[in-house]
């Protein structure tokens, strides 16, 4: 093979195949919180199929299970618990809100 043809050949990269996110023994159910929580974002949103690497059927079942768990209040609809940290007390400027005695 001459050099001109070698330039167009792609090198075969070895890649490790990822494990499927849902094993064959896993049951997609609204009570299986460990499985369901893997497919939620930090904000509590359902992740897309491309991110999850699920088939269409699995994604549909996961979505239904998450929605059932939310309705039965096993899962929150929103996960927006923000940690507010106040660093010391802030002094208020005197002026508009002064109390009259």
Curated annotation (Swiss-Prot):
GO MF annotation terms: rRNA binding; structural constituent of ribosome
GO biological process: translation
Localization annotation: Plastid, Chloroplast
InterPro entries: Ribosomal_bS18, Ribosomal_bS18_CS, Ribosomal_bS18_sf
GO cellular component: chloroplast; ribonucleoprotein complex; ribosome
Chief place of localization: plastid
Alphabetically ordered keywords of this record: Chloroplast, Plastid, Ribonucleoprotein, Ribosomal protein, RNA-binding, rRNA-binding
SUPFAM superfamilies found in the cross-reference section: Ribosomal protein S18
PROSITE patterns named in the record: RIBOSOMAL_S18
TM regions (residue ranges): none
Signal peptide as annotated in the record: none
The family this protein is said to belong to: Belongs to the bacterial ribosomal protein bS18 family.
Subunit structure and binding partners: Part of the 30S ribosomal subunit.
UniProt cross-references to PANTHER family, sorted A to Z: 30S RIBOSOMAL PROTEIN S18 (PTHR13479), SMALL RIBOSOMAL SUBUNIT PROTEIN BS18M (PTHR13479:SF40)
NCBIfam families: S18
Protein name: Small ribosomal subunit protein bS18c
UniProt organism field: Citrus sinensis (Sweet orange)
Gene name, Swiss-Prot/TrEMBL: rps18
